Regions:
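An amphipathic alpha-helical interaction surface
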Residues: 1-9, 89-198
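Membrane-proximal alpha-helical anchors
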Residues: 2-111, 121, 192-198
Length: 198
């Protein structure tokens, strides 16, 4: 007995339509996957940047840890990542003061008598998270009392400007006259004669 099973011819549009729908679905899933991957990558970049974010701060005081009269000018990193200091300036009335003698002469009438100070250069240093650096210490003892008293008032008129970067080369500019550091594309070059050298 010879039995043939009749085969129904497939409609010309039915097979193609399902192929198109399957292809469109696959493309849609691929686009969603790509979008999720890009979004995840951006989130990872932001998390990495936040995990190495430095935050430079400037401060000044007039008491040493032992209670003695010592004027200090300090810069510290209160962020979570290291701060690479690219430039650092101290200005008084808009003029750079590259060292303690220059600053004390400009602000406080330091004459030919030497001032007894402890200073430190800042540019080119790396401050780890939580680290603080005193770049100028002026003890009252061994210094002219009139110069010390005047500097104790005028230290608030000294302006500190610095540019620093994270390990990912994101950079900020600190200006002691502004509330917080501002992001910059890169740190500008500052002439050596205008950099704080201590």
């Amino acid at each position: 007995m010879n039995t043939e099973i009749p085969v129904q011819p497939r409609g010309a549009t039915g097979g193609r339509l399902s192929n198109y729908l399957a292809s469109a679905f696959a493309i849609g899933v691929s686009m969603i996957s790509l979008s999720v991957a890009i979004s995840s990558n951006r989130t990872q970049e932001r998390l990495l940047a936040a995990s190495v974010w430095p935050a430079l701060e400037y401060g000044t005081g007039n008491r040493g840890a032992d209670g003695s009269d010592v004027i200090s000018m300090n810069v510290g990193n209160s962020g979570v990542g290291p701060a690479r200091l690219r430039s650092f300036q101290v200005l008084y009335q808009g003029r750079p003061a590259p060292n303690a003698a220059s600053l004390l002469t400009q602000c406080c009438g330091l004459a030919d008598a030497p001032a007894y100070t402890v200073t430190s250069g800042v540019s080119g240093r790396v401050l780890k998270a939580g680290e603080e650096l005193s770049f100028l210490l002026l003890p009252r003892e061994k210094n002219d009392a009139a110069v010390w008293d005047r500097f104790n008032r005028e230290r608030f008129n000294a302006r500190v400007q610095a540019c620093y970067c994270s390990v990912l080369d994101a950079c900020w500019r600190l200006d002691s006259e502004l509330a917080e550091p501002e992001p910059v594309a890169s740190c500008p070059d500052v002439p050596d004669a205008q950099e704080w050298s201590g």
